[in-house]
Amino acid sequence: MELLKEILQIYMERREWFLELFGQHLKIAGIAIVLAGIMGLLFGIFIAEKEFMAPVILTLANIFYTIPSISLLGILIPFTGIGDKTAIIALTLYGLMPMIRNTYTGICGVSQEIIQAARGMGSTDIQILWRIKLPLALGVILAGVRNMVVMTLSVTAIAAFIGAGG
């Protein structure tokens, strides 16, 4: 119990410093989450519509995801330097896999009967994507967003090893 009191006392004494680090952590993670979310959604839609590209893009996303985070940060340092930029690039690369895979899986899981019915009513491919496929795939896509956000927030702490804030 005494240890807990000492830890709380340190947090209270250095409150501004900890809040500044917390803000830096959220900024780095937030930028990476937005970038990975947008890019992952676009790549997922692309490979769902162009099936022949799915193995290539999914393999690349899986490769980035399997590299240990501290190693990926080390690999990027010679190219992007030390700091927030390197951390954001690495976190974005990590966040792509859950987004790409879940977007692809969600869109490919839409029933072909529903798509054919929409085509029969005169819908264009863009209308089918925006009005049929994406709304029906939204649950799976949001599960990917959740996984990506949790993973990105947790890995962001490791970015401090390469001089990134937080």
Q: Model-found features: residue ranges?
A:
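Short membrane-interfacial helix/loop motifs at transmembrane-helix boundaries
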Residues: 1-14
